[in-house]
Amino acid sequence: MCSLSSKITFPTVDVKTARSKINVNSVRLIDVRREEDYNQEHILNAVNLPLADLLSGDSPETIIKLFEKLGIADDTEVIVYDDTFGALASRVAWTLQYIGHKNVTLLDVTYSQWKELGLKISIEKPNIQPVKHSLNINPDIMATAEYLENAKENGNVVLIDNRERLNFLEQHIPGSINIPYRALATDGKILRTKESMRNLLKSRGIPEDAEIITYCGSVGTLSGLAYYALKSIGIPNVRLYVNSFKEWKKLEKPIAKQENASYWDLSAE
């Protein structure tokens, strides 16, 4: 059973809606690009949180202080964007959700796409006052290696590997299904349409009522994007194996590979 905070009604926000909120300063916009890129230019009123800064946090308490410094309180509406097809932004948004923040979405385009549309950018940094944010860990959206190992015995659990196809063929967690992160996007948007996403799952034989666990190579960026892609079509029970395949290998857990892969295996979406 998922907690209320694991239910996401709108995983992404469109450009028109984001613009209107930015213009009246009713939203906290987080730019997840590198600091030097942010300093050159960014979307109007955005604050900067490079993913590396977030990943350096060694506890939820440390991480929540990063968000407090960005002026994010419990009731702050947050939109996150990047310039890497939504993967880094997804990891930041997921972390906010994990620590208990309920109102966070992804901008449905990248920074480059925003700029190509001729929308407002700036070099000015907003003046932000630190605030307080409560810590309410949401365990229902995270999978550990132990949880994953136990869940694999359940017939209604699906494990999705979001790495590149070749990486999957060489090594993967036994029983996982490969949906490369590149398959999640559509032209001009970081995620497929809902209908297209449902068709993708159907083509892989993945039921929408299953518990789905996503993973990628190391820190949960590519699989974070998959997490929100699944949430976009209303799948209620999705978890991110945040430490992903890197940890799985380090723990010397079982690993599978596909022998004698054909051209189709390599080129499959």
Residue ranges and their predicted role:
Residues 1-40, 86, 108-170, 256-269:
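Flexible, polar/low-complexity N-terminal or interdomain linker segments that lie immediately upstream
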Residues 2-9, 54-143, 211, 216-245:
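Thiolate-centered catalytic microenvironments shared by cysteine-dependent enzyme domains
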Residues 29, 46-48, 104-106, 159, ...:
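Conserved beta-strand scaffold positions in the cores of enzyme catalytic domains, especially
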Residues 44-58, 180-189:
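Acidic/glycine-enriched edge-of-secondary-structure segments
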Residues 46, 96, 176, 230, ...:
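Terminal peptide-recognition signature
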Residues 57-67, 193-208:
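Append "and occasionally in soluble cytosolic enzymes with long acidic Gly/Pro-rich linkers
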Residues 151-200:
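A mid-sequence, solvent-exposed acidic-amphipathic segment
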Residues 239-265:
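Cysteine-dependent PTP/DSP-like catalytic domain, specifically the C-terminal lobe
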